[in-house]
């Protein structure tokens, strides 16, 4: 097993889960940057029904075990992110025409999820009518393989502008950008879809929020392996003893999204290191 996978598993087991500034179960990113030395870790499980894979022709109920991410504030204007899935398990219910035959003997297949590395840079803070704005760049590494029927074997790149605005006690999040997706079936061809997300976080109690979003990507139609995707997520966030838990329902809006699903998880934030003061030279 590659070394990074053992590291990700160790993170998921050792790091406790949940904090107020992270926006799980939403996938629309927050424009706010963690303060220097702050670390935020989250961990969750997803149960998704009727998930389709165009390259392998597989369809079934997908269980995602260990949907995890680590965010680290590395400076006043920068944040580093790493995320992945410890194990994707698909209970196969249907098999359609395939482009790459999956190598499985039964009705279940599994694989590690793709690893995503990202950097978020703060451009401006929220002030008056102006929202907070950040820029994010991320790369998704192809760890899930064709043999399992769950991967594309393509490195993908993402860039987006992130926005955040408070309205009374509520928060509005939005992002817009584009992706560069290599074609798994046509050598040298790529798709550059628009990526988007808009979300709301509405407090209804001191320790309870309602959350909702629509998020996805849209590009040229009929691109095998690079299909358009869009999801709606609605749910709650709640706190117990400094740990924030989340629960949400998922509804897919395209043919290659899950028909429905449930996600649960938690997030924890802590101070990992202090910013060293700059030395002062007296002449």
Where would I find each of the regions flagged by the language model?
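Sec/Tat signal peptide C-region and signal peptidase I cleavage site
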Residues: 15-21
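Bacterial N-terminal signal peptides that target proteins for export
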Residues: 1-8
């Amino acid at each position: 097993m590659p070394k990074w996978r053992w590291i990700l598993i160790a993170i998921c087991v050792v790091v406790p889960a949940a904090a107020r500034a992270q926006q799980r179960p939403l996938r629309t990113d927050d424009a706010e940057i963690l303060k220097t030395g702050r670390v935020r870790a989250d961990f969750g499980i997803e149960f998704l029904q009727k998930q389709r894979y165009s390259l392998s022709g597989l369809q079934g109920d997908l269980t995602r075990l260990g949907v995890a991410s680590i965010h680290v504030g590395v400076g006043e204007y920068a944040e580093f992110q790493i995320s992945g899935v410890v194990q994707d398990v698909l209970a196969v219910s249907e098999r359609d025409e395939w482009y790459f035959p999956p190598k499985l003997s039964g009705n279940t297949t599994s694989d590690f999820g793709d690893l995503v590395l990202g950097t978020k840079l703060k451009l401006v803070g929220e002030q008056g009518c102006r929202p907070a704005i950040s820029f994010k760049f991320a790369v998704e590494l192809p760890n899930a393989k064709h043999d399992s029927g769950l991967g594309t074997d393509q490195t993908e790149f993402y860039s987006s502008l992130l926005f955040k605005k408070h309205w009374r006690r509520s928060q509005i999040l939005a992002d817009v950008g584009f992706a560069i997706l290599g074609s798994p079936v046509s050598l040298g061809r790529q798709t550059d879809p628009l990526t988007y997300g808009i979300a709301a976080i509405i407090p209804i109690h001191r320790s309870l929020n309602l959350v909702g979003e629509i998020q996805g990507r849209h590009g040229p139609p009929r691109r095998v392996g690079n299909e358009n995707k869009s999801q709606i997520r609605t749910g709650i966030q709640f706190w117990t003893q400094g740990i924030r838990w989340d629960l949400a329902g998922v509804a897919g809006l395209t043919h290659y999204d899950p028909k429905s699903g449930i996600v649960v998880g938690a997030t924890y934030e802590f101070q990992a290191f202090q910013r060293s003061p700059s030395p002062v030279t007296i002449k």
